[in-house]
From Swiss-Prot:
Entry function: May be involved in transcriptional regulation.
Database matches in PROSITE patterns: SCAN_BOX, ZINC_FINGER_C2H2_1, ZINC_FINGER_C2H2_2
Name assigned to this protein: Zinc finger and SCAN domain-containing protein 12
Annotated Basic and acidic residues bias: 213-231
Swiss-Prot/TrEMBL keywords: DNA-binding, Isopeptide bond, Metal-binding, Nucleus, Repeat, Transcription, Transcription regulation, Ubl conjugation, Zinc, Zinc-finger
GO cellular component: nucleus
Gene assigned in the entry: ZSCAN12
Taxonomic path: Eukaryota, Metazoa, Chordata, Craniata, Vertebrata
Principal cellular location given in the protein's record: nucleus
Family statement: Belongs to the krueppel C2H2-type zinc-finger protein family.
Protein source organism: Pongo pygmaeus (Bornean orangutan)
């Protein structure tokens, strides 16, 4: 790119405004007219129109005239109908009202109508809500932002959209995964090379970019090869292979055959002899032009035989077919989990390495996946449009609402492949799987038990007696936050876990699960000594004390020991003593003390 955009407006009061765009040296009037029709140049004029300052002019008349000319260059009433101009204005306002974290990303897709924006956002919402190959509490392993014509593997490249760089620099999209290029190149051969070249050309600056970007990307932009930032600043042979293959003199790219070398050298100098008749964009290879023209014609020749969905490029179709085949060729060396996409594996590996590339601009919290950041941002905006009809709780995502509804229905769709245990939430499954995935490597020095890192911290509170979670109503303290949440339902009266069979509600999910076994007759906990079976693990533990003779609950007054910590029913006390009210009250008070402490307090 010769230089950055510069606009100069010189006007006398009696002369028409003259706007000069200095980007390239156009040799003919036809070149300039063709360039004027480019969508990106219209975007430049729109930016100057919106950001025009009154102080830049000598007076109000000049300011008005310059605004008129900039608006004319943007909307172009000589070529656009009223409906098209109206659509441009609606599109601009639509992009303006989008959440800030979405604006820059949507504008990178270069939508030309409001309908295109809607399609992009609906596709994004569907991908965010899909369970996919999930490995974290927030999202799954998904390529949410890889649409058909979005570049793959441009790691380290800054966004070249004028809007994202100038108007909203702090919402630039984080880099995508560069490894995808290598994988897809192997799978699809030269087809991906063609697509990669076009993507590189489409990512050339069209707006008010800085010379810094041009210097950093001068090599990679010429030939479409991708380099990491450190590779660009170091030796140009960083991408060449160790086995002395022919390399390009321009950038050190390895080439396997002489034909590849000839073709590659024609691309590197920037020769672009194939021009698009619709928008004027030029390409170095005819195949790139053909694929680009499908944007204008709407042609999608590559059709999936399974679902009928069509695509503009063969590479995108190949990537799509993995959904139907269920193939998962990319395997994690740490835990053995397999994925259908390289990017999914790459994101998953961040769980092991601890890398978190995506940061929240509001609170600084970091995430390993882009979807996790998007969901987190909604917390700050308090955007919770999805409401549960059972308990009226609201959620920021439809997928979270669906998971929450499992609390009421008892559905547990997330099952562990190792032990078969099922969970309502995917995050609970992920935490559980740490047990199987060699995460249980932190040992308690007090008792020798092993836990995950977070599990060890909670466990050690048993030995230290620390109870950091305190109830504000009764000041009772707990070791875990979940225990505090369950306790607080005593004060609020909330019983979110309801039985579908009899309608009875409970404060804890585990109690509901145990209750439902009354209806199903299931008794999964069996005593090894006598064969008796029980609905709950607590009942089994209490029963086993009959065989072991264990009595862990001891009275502080007399030393008498008990197997259970049982309290007498309030209703039972009042019914038995209805003729002697004072006796009933005394017994009711004594029932507030556990059985193993009330044996010596007969004076109540």
């Amino acid at each position: 790119m010769a230089s950055t955009w510069a606009i100069q407006a010189h006007m006398d009061q009696d002369e028409p405004l003259e706007v000069k765009i200095e980007e390239e040296k156009y040799t003919t009037r036809q070149d300039w007219d063709l360039r004027k029709n480019n969508t990106h140049s219209r975007e430049v004029f729109r930016q100057y129109f919106r950001q025009f300052c009154y102080q830049e002019t000598s007076g109000p008349r000049e300011a008005l005239s310059r605004l008129r000319e900039l608006c004319h260059q943007w909307l172009r009433p000589e070529t656009h109908t009223k409906e098209q101009i109206l659509e441009l204005l609606v599109l601009e306002q639509f992009l303006t009202i989008l959440p800030e974290e979405l604006q820059a990303w949507v504008q990178e897709q270069h939508p030309e109508s409001g309908e295109e924006v809607v399609t992009v956002l609906e596709d994004l919402e569907r991908e965010l809500d899909e369970p996919g190959e999930q490995v974290s509490a927030h999202t799954g392993e998904q390529e949410m932002f890889l649409q058909e014509m979005v570049p793959l593997g441009k790691e380290g490249e800054p966004s070249m959209s004028l809007q994202s760089m100038k108007a909203q620099p702090k919402y630039e999209s984080p880099e995508l995964e560069s490894q995808q290029e290598q994988v897809l190149d192997v799978e699809t051969g030269n087809e991906y090379g063609n697509l990669k070249q076009e993507v590189s050309e489409e990512m050339e600056p069209h707006g008010n970019t800085s010379s810094k970007f041009e210097n950093d990307m001068s090599k990679s932009a010429r030939c479409g090869e991708t380099h990491k930032p450190e590779e660009i600043t170091e030796e140009p042979s960083a991408c060449s292979r160790e086995d002395k293959q022919p390399t390009c003199d321009e950038n050190g790219v390895s080439l396997t055959e002489n034909s590849d070398h000839t073709e590659h050298q024609r691309i590197c100098p920037g020769e672009k002899s194939y021009g698009c008749d619709d928008c004027g964009k030029a390409f170095s290879q005819h195949s790139h032009l053909i694929e680009h023209q499908r944007i204008h014609t709407g042609d999608r020749p590559y059709k999936c035989e399974e679902c009928g969905k069509a695509f503009r490029g063969r590479t995108v179709l190949i990537r799509h077919k993995i959904i139907h085949t269920g193939e998962k060729p990319y395997k994690c060396n740490e835990c053995g989990k397999a994925f259908g996409r390289w990017s999914a594996l790459n994101q998953h590996q961040r769980l092991h390495t601890g890398e978190k590339h995506y940061h929240c601009n509001d609170c600084g919290k970091a995430f390993s996946q882009k979807a996790g950041l998007f969901h987190h941002i909604k917390i700050h905006k308090r955007d919770k449009p999805y409401q549960c009809t059972q308990c009226n709780k609201s959620f920021s995502r439809r997928s979270i609402l669906t998971q929450h509804q499992g609390v009421h229905t008892g559905a547990k769709p997330y099952e562990c492949n190792e032990c078969g245990k099922a969970f309502v939430y995917n995050s609970s499954l992920v935490s559980h799987q740490e047990i199987h995935h060699k995460e249980k490597c932190y040992q308690c020095k007090e008792c020798g038990k092993s836990f995950s890192q977070s599990g060890l911290i909670q466990h050690q509170r048993i030995h230290t007696g620390e109870k950091p979670y305190k109830c504000e109503v009764c000041e009772k303290a707990f070791i875990q936050r979940t225990s505090l949440t369950e306790h607080q339902r005593i004060h609020t009266g909330e019983r979110p876990y309801k039985c579908d069979k009899c309608g009875k509600a409970f404060t804890q999910r585990s109690v509901l699960t145990e209750h439902q076994r009354i209806h199903t007759g299931e008794r999964p906990y069996k005593c090894d000594e006598c064969g008796n079976a029980f609905r709950g693990i607590t009942s089994l533990i209490q029963h086993q004390r009959i065989h072991t003779g264990e009595k862990p609950y001891q009275c502080d007054e007399c030393g008498k020991a008990f197997r259970q910590r049982r309290k007498t029913s309030y209703k039972e006390i009042l019914l038995k003593n209805h003729s002697e009210p004072q006796a009933g009250v005394n017994l009711l008070l004594s029932s507030l003390i556990p059985e193993w402490q009330s044996c010596c307090r007969k004076d109540l």
